[in-house]
């Protein structure tokens, strides 16, 4: 930085000025050079005083913010999580233990009728109080394994001390999970939630799939305790999370609980049958607190999800002694999954991008497709375009995660033994009644004639799958083999390259020629190893 030139004083002017000015003036009259950058001058007392005043104001502001935060937290705990309800040794804890051991410790029979104001911890899984099963007919029905009629605000079977049965349908996109979920959604004794982790992925977009696994598990942990306020954390910006209603939950327009009495007069939960989303969207929106009340009435709570990639992510929930969680792993031929992903590629573009971001950068790419001219930078949107490329690229991450889960299931640790069941989609559509009975037996539900007929109707329809995100009655054979005529041979070989490990475990045979693919008389299914 150049110095600006200073005008010279005439001879003899400086002594005269020094004599006429006060003692402090010489410094002021001397030529003033520009201050160098970074040079610090001694602070004046006035400046230090102003600085101290600002520091005090800032500290006071931080202290006030801390106090307001603590008050807000205490207010939340007072309304949402009463401390005396959480204490097993408190009066309500003793009442809960006497009513059947709500914290896992069976207590002695109650000496008298329970007090009306004593209620269980709302955060713990449902366990019927003694009053709910005190009647002799209800107790006899529960011991005989017959579903007792809903009453006293509870549904389903269960005796004193029984835990709520929790189920997670563990699967991936385009695996027939919407139809499989309806087998629980239509059951009058089941509270069903459809892909609630969708809210996490939408809120935290564009986070990759692997980094969102912890948040997904935390949401499931809250939902299995009927704490539906967790939806408010992941509501869209500007939508007012505290004012979120039932109709703001993903999949609510086809949820049988949301669309049925007492939340909505459009349908009845005990009547088996699909709901019309156009009718359900006209239902009055209900507060989440009201939805929580309905959740606590059901003994069986089922959540279907496609955004948990490894069963090990659920290990903390499976280890939790307060939760009785079982995992149903719904699988489908990866080639059929890939074909369905391509057909619905535009509806899954965001999810495909989030999954592809989780790929190992050192992993191989797609040699079969690249050799056939499928490039990521392709301009066209048809076959071989970028949407197809991402749809198939996501299969690498999905199949690698599936291989890890199956490896864990082949040698199950303690937390997974007796809590894991594999169901192939091909077996479901091939023999729906047998598969339904197997699934219901695993989770402790009774198969009604209405549910058997519903499963048969859904797999014997004449409709096609032109609308990939709508559940409808379809031809089972057509749905199971559609990939053999929809995919090119290069696409099939690329999927097999990604998924050969889970295919070997699950009993899906690989193909060797295009002629073998087109020969629909040859089955490519064999007995699975699980």
From Swiss-Prot:
EC identifiers of the protein: 2.8.2.-
Residues bearing carbohydrate: 243, 457, 475
GO molecular function: N-acetylglucosamine 6-O-sulfotransferase activity; sulfotransferase activity
Keywords, comma-separated and alphabetical: Carbohydrate metabolism, Disulfide bond, Glycoprotein, Golgi apparatus, Inflammatory response, Membrane, Signal-anchor, Transferase, Transmembrane, Transmembrane helix
Binding annotation for 3'-phosphoadenylyl sulfate: 173-179, 332-340
Top EC category: transferase
Glycoprotein keyword on record: yes
Function noted in UniProt: Sulfotransferase that utilizes 3'-phospho-5'-adenylyl sulfate (PAPS) as sulfonate donor to catalyze the transfer of sulfate to position 6 of non-reducing N-acetylglucosamine (GlcNAc) residues within keratan-like structures on N-linked glycans and within mucin-associated glycans that can ultimately serve as SELL ligands. SELL ligands are present in high endothelial cells (HEVs) and play a central role in lymphocyte homing at sites of inflammation. Participates in biosynthesis of the SELL ligand sialyl 6-sulfo Lewis X and in lymphocyte homing to Peyer patches.
Record-given protein name: Carbohydrate sulfotransferase 2
Organism whose genome encodes this protein: Homo sapiens
